[in-house]
UniProtKB/Swiss-Prot annotation:
It comes from Neisseria meningitidis serogroup A / serotype 4A (strain DSM 15465 / Z2491). Monomer. Binds 30S ribosomal subunits, but not 50S ribosomal subunits or 70S ribosomes. One of its GO terms (molecular function) is ribosomal small subunit binding. It comes from the Bacteria. It is found in: Cytoplasm. Belongs to the RbfA family. Keywords: Cytoplasm, Ribosome biogenesis. This is Ribosome-binding factor A.
Length: 123
């Protein structure tokens, strides 16, 4: 009988800790005034902890590209600050990706509302 893999529980804890720490670092550690209000929504970590994809959203959609530049510019600083806060053998390389799921959800909701409004009411 195979033993259940226990690595996923640790991986989940690590990614949750990375997400919490990065959210705090982005909120307090980014000194660039061009950075808008950034929310860290999710972090995905590879099994060997060498890479972490950070999914984020911004309050002001017009600042999306500028925010991406700010995060890319601050990537090394954020990683070194993360290394001070988290005790891991290997601190993952950070990759930032805009989280479009919120926009897709809002668009889908608007489409559903539109179809519901156009549908004739049946008795």
């Amino acid at each position: 009988m195979r033993k259940p893999q226990r690595g996923y529980a640790r991986q989940d804890r690590v990614k949750e800790q990375i997400m919490r720490e990065l959210a705090e670092l982005v909120r307090t550690g980014l000194k660039d005034p061009r950075a808008g209000f950034i929310t860290v929504n999710e972090v995905e970590v590879t099994r060997d902890y060498s890479h972490a994809t950070v999914f984020y959203t911004v309050l002001n959609q017009d600042a999306r590209e500028i925010t991406e530049e700010v995060l890319e510019h601050a990537r090394g600083h954020l990683r070194s600050e993360l290394a001070k806060r988290i005790k891991l053998f290997k601190i993952p390389e950070l990759h930032f990706k805009y989280d479009e799921s919120l926009e897709r959800g809002l668009n889908l909701s608007a489409l559903i509302d539109q179809v519901a409004a156009e549908k004739p009411v049946e008795d």
